[in-house]
UniProtKB/Swiss-Prot annotation:
It is a multi-pass membrane protein. Pfam families: DUF3592. This is Inner membrane protein YmfA. It comes from Escherichia coli (strain K12). Signal peptide: none annotated.
Length: 153
């Protein structure tokens, strides 16, 4: 393995391990938050279009659901979701899972497994890719290793 290959391998391995570590920490924090949170059912009562660029018109944006749920039987709380998607465009009346920290229903979020996976999964996948690229860089090519073996007495 050449000196350059060793340096690149170490850089890619280091970045990959850091990304995997971040992924594990995000997963653990999300798992413990979800485990300790209060889970309930909410209803999408409205959707709001937010454009990603205020000066443009057209399709650059997403639909954000407005969700109503009952933290107590006599109190209905309504919140705007921070997660938007075209999926929510015609979703008024749909039921969604909602979760929030005990004592803080005003900080409720939609419990979407795909969004939750994306928070830690994307970072972890990038870490695995960095490690794989580092391993590929560090592997000697078959032609180089054959030449070295033939040239040795």
């Amino acid at each position: 393995m050449s000196q350059d290959s060793k340096v690149f391998f170490r850089i890619f391995l280091g970045i990959g391990l850091v990304l995997i570590l971040i992924s594990v920490v995000v997963f653990y924090n999300q798992f413990t938050y979800s485990k300790d949170a209060i889970h309930t059912e909410g209803v999408i009562v409205d959707t709001v279009w937010h454009s990603s660029h205020s000066h443009r018109t057209g399709k650059d944006g997403s639909w954000y659901p407005v969700v109503a749920f009952r933290p107590t039987p006599d109190y209905t709380l309504i919140f705007n979701s921070s997660i938007g998607s075209d999926f929510y465009e015609d979703s008024e009346g749909d039921k969604v899972n909602v979760y929030y920290s005990p004592g803080h229903p005003e900080k409720a979020e939609i419990n979407n497994p795909w969004v939750n996976f994306f928070k830690w999964g994307f970072i972890g996948i990038m870490g695995v890719i960095f490690i794989a690229v580092g391993l590929l860089i560090s592997m000697p090519s078959s032609k180089k290793s054959r030449r070295k073996r033939k040239s040795r007495p």
